[in-house]
């Protein structure tokens, strides 16, 4: 997103190749292959045991010194990097048919001395029982491509999610935007009920909206909704497909935190 000139918090990426190198160095790649080759994903205890073995290996193995130094050096370059968000970013070899949204962990308000641990914990979350079961359903169980994004922590006034087309009713003429005060992790996890808006992709007009708390006004103004719409269109143009986006606003500035393909759309709509 940064390469497209879109507004994102400063940060850096621990590339998927670093995870692969880590697994090769600690013997994890061979162990994971052995554990998952004949795994019966319908056997809950077997899946939990496999997950525990893999995750324990990852979190108990120190990062290679060159990688640890590179991560800490990149962290020191962040102007306001005292606290960061450490976000998982997993993509299968066929990323348009398997979205890993919600399968891995992300961490907020991470201090400098905890960054390396949180990177390993993000990697380990790729092998949670839920994630193993999900990838088995998508026939990508052996895929171990996992990047980690480290961003300056944004103390947001408002946060939410945006779908650049309507994924529920399969409407490609409108966007669905949800927003709530403060940080947005509660929306993503389902703990917070946000405002819900449906806006026209063409002109930004608000077609529908729902505010769950009748005692407060809308979280997002028409101007903010239109700003998000414009960013959504730019994201689609950059990635080439409808997007599921996490966003936030700080002092009136809209920032994009994460974007992934929407994988639940039908062929027509």
Regions found by a protein language model. Give the residues of each.
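Conserved catalytic alpha/beta cores of large enzymes that bind or transform nucleotide phosphates
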Residues: 174-251, 269
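Short beta-strand segments
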Residues: 87, 151, 176-178
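Short beta-strand scaffold segments in enzyme catalytic cores
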Residues: 160-163
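Short, flexible loop/turn elements at secondary-structure junctions
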Residues: 90, 152-154, 181, 249-251, ...
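N-terminal beta-alpha lobe that positions the nucleotide/phosphoryl donor
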Residues: 1-149, 158, 220-223, 230-240, ...
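Short conserved beta-strand segments at catalytic cores or DNA/RNA-binding microdomains
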Residues: 165-167
């Amino acid at each position: 997103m940064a390469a497209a000139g879109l507004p994102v918090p400063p940060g850096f990426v621990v590339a998927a190749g670093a995870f692969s190198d880590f697994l090769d160095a600690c013997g994890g790649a061979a162990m994971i292959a052995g554990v998952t080759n004949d795994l019966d994903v319908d056997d809950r205890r077997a899946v939990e045991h496999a997950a525990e073995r893999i995750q324990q290996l990852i979190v108990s193995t120190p990062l290679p010194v060159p990688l640890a130094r590179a991560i800490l050096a990149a962290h020191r370059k962040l102007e306001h990097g005292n606290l960061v968000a450490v976000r998982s970013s997993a993509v299968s070899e066929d990323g348009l048919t398997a979205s890993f949204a919600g399968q891995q962990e992300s961490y907020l308000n991470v201090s400098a001395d905890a960054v390396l641990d949180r990177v390993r914990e993000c990697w380990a979350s790729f092998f949670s029982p839920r994630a193993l079961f999900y990838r088995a359903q998508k026939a990508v169980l052996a895929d171990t491509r996992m990047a980690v994004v480290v961003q300056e922590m944004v103390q947001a006034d408002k946060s939410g999610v945006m779908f650049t087309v309507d994924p529920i009713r399969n409407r490609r003429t409108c966007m669905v935007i949800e927003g709530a005060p403060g940080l947005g992790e509660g929306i993503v996890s389902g703990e917070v009920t946000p405002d819900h808006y449906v806006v026209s992709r063409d002109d930004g007009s608000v077609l529908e909206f729902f505010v769950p708390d009748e005692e407060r006004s809308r979280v997002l103004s028409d101007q903010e909704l239109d700003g998000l719409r414009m960013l959504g269109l730019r994201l689609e143009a950059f990635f080439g497909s409808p997007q599921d986006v996490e966003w936030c606003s700080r002092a009136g500035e809209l920032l994009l935190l994460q974007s992934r393909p929407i994988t639940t759309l039908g062929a027509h709509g």
